Amino acid sequence: CNSRHHSLVRAVCYSPFDHVGVVAINDQGDKVLLESCVIGCVAFDLEARVRQYLRHMAHAVAWRKLVVPTSTRDPLQTALTQACARFVEEVDGKPYDYSVMKIFFTMRKSASDASEGDASERAYYCSEIVAALYQRCGLLRKACNAASFWPGDLADGGVCERWLAEGVKLEPMVLLDG
């Protein structure tokens, strides 16, 4: 994004980017861009939000396609779509939470059930909401804490790749042209 705060986040995290969101499906079956930003957790219209980023809000916009195992794709697709839509509905309108204590002092591994993408009465940081959605859908192992992920952890070769469920992968990052 185009601000000093976001430049600082990139520098501190050694990350190519400072903010992440996730393309998700809402309960109407529409593709949305689910983000946690200063205005809170919001499911934005996908095309309109990407246009905003490309025109006014970011130096660059990139995406990574999530791939599930081909052999289980059909039976899994309905369950994934339903879990995704429920999560989007539960978190839309929740507050944003960027806490240095939360991010710096959260252990990567979690022995509690708090990492299961439970959306009740929570606030989220941008990369945390992505990890929590992946966990809810069974795409990211629950042995890690969603709050421990930084935006750069979702980049090519990032920590997130090591925590993906068996057979799930993220394709290489693709930059979008404005």
Residue ranges and their predicted role:
Residues 1-178:
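Cysteine-nucleophile amide-bond enzymes
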